[in-house]
Swiss-Prot record:
Subcellular localization(s) per the UniProt record: Cytoplasm
Lineage: Bacteria, Bacillati, Chloroflexota, Dehalococcoidia, Dehalococcoidales
Gene source species: Dehalococcoides mccartyi (strain ATCC BAA-2266 / KCTC 15142 / 195) (Dehalococcoides ethenogenes (strain 195))
E.C. code: 5.3.1.1
Residues annotated as the enzyme's active site: H94 (electrophile), E163 (proton acceptor)
Protein name per UniProt: Triosephosphate isomerase
Gene: tpiA
Amino acid sequence: MRQIIIAGNWKMNTTLSEACTLVQGMKYELDQISGIQKIVCPPFISLAPVKTILDGSSIHLGAQNLFYEEKGAYTGEISPLMLQDICPYVIIGHSERRAYFGETGQVVNRKIKAALQAGIMPIVCVGEKLEENENGQTRQILETQMKEALAGINPSSIIIAYEPIWAIGTGKAATAAEANNTISYIRKVLGDIWGNTASRITPILYGGSVNEKNTAELLCQSDIDGALVGGASLKAESFVSICRQAADVRK
């Protein structure tokens, strides 16, 4: 059985002091929750101090992005080598990176390769826009994104996150059945690329307005292995509640 993973993507939120306060406010409660993987992804400047706070904790740390080169004249970028000793996870290919910073499937692919080379597990994001969903293009878009992201990469330890763009930060989530149906298709595409064994063991998360009210229903679905949580991860009590519900699903 695939382990449930709950990852909190803080995006461009929290100052350094706010990040430390937030993680301190959830650390004790999260450490009481077992049977699931818990990940928090604060902004880059907070990674090191948050890591110190989480030392010895069951909570894992992730970055929100990286660049595909190890070092050099790439002003403002963060390399895999810089993250290697700080966090075991990194989000790659989030729709906001694709939309605001022009990240293509080829760039996402290079970043995944760089993360794996550095021993960092990528959380690879895929998802369709509202108009693509309404035009019946969801499967086509997701298949293209998956094939571009994993081109030339052998079966590896990765996490996939399905985030329908129309549901991110809008309060409008896919129904549990819709999300499960789409994730089942993503798993089929992964099987076509990497084979059935890799498809069966790779965790696929749902993201997009995940909150305390819809978590349990989402995680009861057969193909949904967890959640990539946005806004609700910025409140300690909400994130703890989501993680607690996730653990209860597997009891």
